[in-house]
Amino acid sequence: MCGVNYQDHPSREASARELIESAGGRMPQETEGSLRTAVANAMVGMKKQLYGRGPTAAKAWILDDYVFVVLEGGLTRNEETLLADGKADLVREYRLSFQETVGATAMGAVEELLERRVLTYHSQIVFDPPRTFEIFVLEPQ
């Protein structure tokens, strides 16, 4: 499992705007639907920027103090090769370790877009079909 606490990674890398633009999107207006789209685009942009390949589809939900993002596809060719050889655990371990390393970027993008502090962040991946799940816990309002 990959979990990142806000206190563990206070520094930020790419801004939400940079991540969204790298996914081909634009910054949102102040509607809930556009914020969900912006969060999804920021996660796509982060994966694209850091893995060299992005998901094929993404959707985000914002519910009270929680943000859930589901990303479809986006495995790299070397990850697909390892999966074909039965090494799903190795791919999962690498992905989750990498997400811990770049968690501050994901958290920073969500904080910037929603204007709320992220208390903790968790990432998980499954392979059949390939899906990545990004979960953020927001500070209560």
List each language-model region with its residue ranges.
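Intrinsically disordered or compositionally simple regulatory linkers and C-terminal tails
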Residues: 11, 15-16
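Intrinsic-disorder-associated, low-complexity terminal segments enriched in Asp/Asn/His/Tyr and depleted
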Residues: 5-9
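Interaction-mediating elements
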Residues: 19-141
